[in-house]
From Swiss-Prot:
This is Uncharacterized protein ycf80. GO terms for cellular component: chloroplast. InterPro entries: Tic22-like. Belongs to the ycf80 family. The gene is ycf80. Keywords: Chloroplast, Plastid. It is found in: Plastid, Chloroplast. GO terms for biological process: protein transport. It comes from Porphyra purpurea (Red seaweed). It comes from the Eukaryota.
Amino acid sequence: MYCSQAITQTSRLPVSNNFYCKKTFFSSVNSNYQNLSQMQSWSSLKVLAFGLPDLHSIPVNLNNSFQEAIVISTINDNNIFADVTNSWIKMHKDKNHYSLFYKEIFKALLTKQIHVIDSPIGSKDIDNKIILIQQYIWKKGLKSPQFNSIARLNKNVDISNISTKFIMEQLSTSPVFVVKNGLNEIILGHPLSRIRRTAFNQIASSLSNLFHQPIATSPISNGLFFFHPDDAIEFKNFVQSKAPEACKDMDIKIQPVGLHVAYKMNRNFSSDIQFRFVPDFKEVGDLIFRHQQAKNLHFHENQYYGKNFFQGQPIYMIQPIIIKHRNGRISIIKFTGANDDREVVFTNLEAANKSWANFIKRTPYLKRLKKPNLLVYNLESFLKDKEVLHKADLTKFIVVTNKSAYITTKESVTLPYHNGLSKHLELNVKPKLFFVKLWIRRLLFTLTYE
């Protein structure tokens, strides 16, 4: 394939030492495809192939404001770019030019700076010469928020929606785990490109957050919610191994939070932060390599899985049992919890089997069914399916996680919330006191340092 570029700019600027056969500045990026005869007649036409212009003579702030239109087309003798591309290759045999271009393209793809601005790739008839072409926009610098399209681009799930409010109520009794510091802040994972990003990108991100409009100027940072405490501990140990002094200084620890809190944060997006569920790794491994072929497991039709992979956090739902009595009467036995008729969603196969064993003790004619029929799905998709339901179709459910999660949660709650004051002290006052203590310690260290 050939790759050619047309740089767009609002004013004419001198460009020296560039790689172009001919050159011009189009007034708009939408000047996508020009008639072949017109292109050949324009002496100012600029077409680039396999190279980038040398823009060192242009001030940095102007250089960063560039955006390029990239046209990708198939190799064809009738291709309008073929001749100029071949001529450019012959003129510039230095492979550094070639590699530089693709290095920049690859970097832009990774940081999501290249976007399609035309319909999917198709044929274009230019002077009866059919070629396959597709145009993209390469954003090279600061991108300001488009204030007139905030509602269209806001990808947040409306937490005030009836279905999402209902879901949060059902998730409130289930624990997950995060790694926090003494300021009650979740530890985030940042890509290297974000740590090194420029002041312009920092400003763009801040503006995007202000107007709730996500922009893809760099890979997002991730906050993690763990279903099993052992996985959270492993992540904490990894962070401590990378920065032991900082972790000690910042009082890094794991802490249980309600699954409803994790769900709310997972379904809200900022410009560069996203919160993700981390499945129980042991549970996923056991399901894939030990239990996948079990006859009592039936996978949901929308579940994505294979011999060595499974999408999301596994959940198990005990399916109703059809019983035919001796008198010909048919009964449908639905599994329920001990105290109510809520649908029970298990994130652990062992918990599902034990609950079934307790259930059949209360139903003697089911004792011959040693194992329940289980529908296997993933929690993320299960919740998304619930989000689109109408109020009349919503049914109560409860998520039962692994035994270790409840034990760890019980051990972690050292300050019982008997009243609103205790909760306020734990969540608001304690982090502020830690902040003061931290900076006093740092100030004393600075004053005593020789």
